[in-house]
Amino acid sequence: FCRILDEAYDQGVGFLVIEPAKGEYKDVFGGLDDVHVFGTNPAFTPLLRIDPFSFPQGIHVLEHLDRLVEIFNVCWPMYAPMPAVLKDAISRSYEDCGWNLTTSENSFGEGLYPSFADVARNVREILDSSEYDAENKGAYKGSLLTRLNSLTNGLNGMMLTSDGVDDATLFDGNTIIDLSRVGSTETKSLFMGLIVLKLQEHRMAAADGMNQPLRHLTVLEEAHNLLKRTSMEQSTEGGNLLGKSVEMLSNSIAEMRTYGEGFIIADQAPGLLDMAAIRNT
């Protein structure tokens, strides 16, 4: 794929590489003057910083909220009421920050968004006031709060911040995002999903028409981390939530082509990719 990127670069087509495995692209392209490299270890690269809760002007808060919940459904094991609890907690967190979920306006002014600490607090309050029995309540709180709290401290807390890298820097130029040093597969998938979400909304907000020629190319390496093959069988916990979420994410990637965004979905084990992703190539 380096040759394809090289040719795109020569023709003035910008690129974004999301690399969760080896970190080789930064060695090939990282030395070029107009290529930005971001990673997860500030000793080697500038730190990737994104705000999962912010969205560009022109995107409705509920649009963003739904897409964000789909990312969590893909990346975290969810069962029974957990997706609904998480969505409710995120909704309340936006309202706590002054957002009107109907008008998508903030009474405190622009630029104020919730954090994972806000969401964790609301998850706890929702479950504490629920009618689930103590055993299930403890299981749901343990699963959700452990994951949410892990995103508020350490490197995750430094990267998932309100002081994010400008979207234009990430998505309009030439950028390599090296996630190869992230240890947790769940966290790696989450970062990949959040980047794709931010890219999608950036393209939608900046769109100046449909069926645009190729303007930008995104390479999604080891794509099974995000677009993993799932069983199509219904489960006793309320249906194939993961499969539906992966399919929606795959469709979002396909729909970005109308804004001039090209995608290369790469994987050494294509059998691990969901069929929805393969159909869209």
Task: Locate predicted features.
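Acidic, metal-coordinating catalytic cores used for nucleic-acid/nucleotide bond scission
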Residues: 9, 269-272
